[in-house]
Each structure stands twice: as C-alpha cells, then as structure tokens.
Amino acid sequence: MPQMAPVMTIDGPSGAGKGTLCQLLAEKLGWHLLDSGAIYRVLALAALHHDVELDAEAALVPLAANLDVQFQVDAEQVKVVLEGEDVSRTIRTEEVGNAASKIAAFPRVREALLRRQRAFRQAPGLIADGRDMGTVVFPEAEVKIFLDASAEERAARRYKQLQDKGFDVNFERLLTEIRERDDRDRNRAVAPLKPAEDALVVDSTAMSIDEVLVTVLAYAEQQLGDVSTN
C-alpha cells in the first residue's frame, strides 16, 4: 500500500493567525492547502445565496455534499473558489463568519463535508487549517499544531485586518462576537474546539508571525525529519 502524503494540522480559535501561518507554510513547503473554516464559510455563503435557513440542517446537508470549492495558492494570497467564482473577499465578512459558526454545529453537515476535506490529502503534503483538523478530520496527522492567542489580541488583529480591507467595524462588538464564537466552538457537543492530545500548543499573543513560523517549522522537522522547502 503506498504511503499517504504527510499532513500538518493547524487548529485554533478565530483570529489566532492560522490563515497567515498556513499560507506561509504551504508556500514554504510547496504543499497543498485546506482551509476548513473557508469551506464552512463557502457553505454559509451558498446557503445565504440560495435562501436556505441556517437552522435547517436537512436542507444544508445536500448543499454541503455537493459543494464545489478549491483553494488556489499563489505568492500573494489564497483564492477561495466556489463553482468557478472567486469568493475570497465575500466569505470573510462577519455575517458569513457568524453564519459559518452556526452551521458548523450540525453533526450531519460536518459529516457531509468530512469526506471532501480528507480528499485534499495529496502529495507532496497537506497543510490543514481549521478547528478540529487534528482531532477529527486528520487524527493520524504527523504534525499537529494548536495556535492560540488571547481574545483581545485576536480582536485587535481582526479589527486591523477588516479595516485594511475597507470594512467599517466596531472593536467592542468584534471582541464580543469573538468571545461568543469561542464559547460556542469550545462547548458544542460535536467536535468542540480543543487541542489534540499530541498537538504542540503555540500561544501567539506576544509572537510575530515569523516567530510562529520558525517554531512550527522546527517542530515539523522533529516530527517528519528533513522536510523539503522551496
């Protein structure tokens, strides 16, 4: 039986810096990228476009099963493509983000997207960005990272990110939404947000992205041996 491509899972709460880290890792290693959170955001956007109620699990399941999503990594950004359309900017609004968190709590919706996510595991390797990548989707992954940061720091990062993209946002409201989302994600019955038992926990509150990248690459070398880099 051929050896499966290695997987590095990067889990953690919203705003911890997972997206930036995963993009840098995918570029550095030349590996494929799976943005699990984006898949849920794409599904949420599809639901909003098709007027599917966010609490209608039975209607969301077939929508999830037939979701056509791709991630195109280049030197500057990761493009999220839904049925041929670049929805990278649209899915990053707070409305879509909150909708994604709600639909992710449905067990049958998560199951419908599970197989699609696992299909991203292809040579030479996969960087899997999410909240339950190391605990549920790829429990056998060779490298597991749990990237964390304080709620205040994550709100500040998100505030700056949205402002830079031209969105009008309120910091206090953003902080409240992050805390509420944390509570939902950490306490949901299915796949709650928590580090895998064999994950390296990295608190990025006082770290630069470069420091986080060096830490993660060093750990990957320990777990995998010599990883080829671009």
UniProtKB/Swiss-Prot annotation:
- Which compartments does it reside in? Cytoplasm
Q: Which InterPro entries match?
A: Cytidylate_kin (IPR003136), Cytidylate_kinase_dom (IPR011994), P-loop_NTPase (IPR027417)
Return the broad EC class. transferase
Write the Enzyme Commission number(s) for this entry. Answer: 2.7.4.25
- Swiss-Prot/TrEMBL keywords: ATP-binding, Cytoplasm, Kinase, Nucleotide-binding, Transferase
Q: Its catalytic activity? A: CMP + ATP = CDP + ADP; dCMP + ATP = dCDP + ADP
Q: Is this entry keyworded Nucleotide-binding?
A: yes
NCBIfam families, alphabetically?
A: cmk
* Lineage top rank: taxon: Bacteria
Its gene is cmk
This chain belongs to which protein, by name?
Cytidylate kinase
Which organism's genome codes for this protein? Aeromonas hydrophila subsp. hydrophila (strain ATCC 7966 / DSM 30187 / BCRC 13018 / CCUG 14551 / JCM 1027 / KCTC 2358 / NCIMB 9240 / NCTC 8049)
Q: One cellular component GO annotation, for this chain's record?
A: cytosol
